[in-house]
Amino acid sequence: NSGIANACTGKQGLDCCEAEAKCAGELLGVPTDAVLVASTGVIGMQIPVDKITAGIEKLVAAKADTLEAGSDAAHAIMTTDTISKEIAIETQIGGKTVTLGGMCKGSGMIHPNMCTMLGFVTTDAKISKKMLQEALSEDVKDTYNMVSVDGDTSTNDTVLLLANGLAENPEITEKLSLIHIS
């Protein structure tokens, strides 16, 4: 959600996140704990859950597996950004085509009106949880974790890396894997 950060909102804020995740999970046919919620906006205000869940219903009805839908999502998360930030690539791993896509928003300004950095990276690569976390941690230490605008960071800065393994490539289980990536 954009407009309200849902930070410093106590149990009611947590309940709002859980309601959003439950709504999305039910509509998408996935477990609630498979839904991740990210927020950007004003700190300390409560989220209008009814408005958000109505929006989730519209998004699920309009979802598509197209480049245009991905671009629409990248534009939808923009706040103070002047351009969307998105990329998608395909490569071969172990003779299988693997896709990696990413989008992010922020950070044009932080202080005095904090603006959150949100980053979402998805892949259909088959990779172990350990290697996925290691790749993300190694990447953000020299990128996202070095960003400071006006000497501040946001309460809600988020980077998510998700892999579903549907590419059916040989599983990446070690950093210096013998799998040829071209």
Task: For the regions a language model picked out, list residue spans one by one.
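Short arginine-rich
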Residues: 143-147
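Glycine-rich, mobile lid/loop segments that gate access to catalytic sites or pores
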Residues: 18, 23-142, 154
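Glycine-rich anion/phosphate-binding loops
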Residues: 11-19
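Conserved small/polar residues in nucleotide/adenosyl-binding loops
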Residues: 179-181
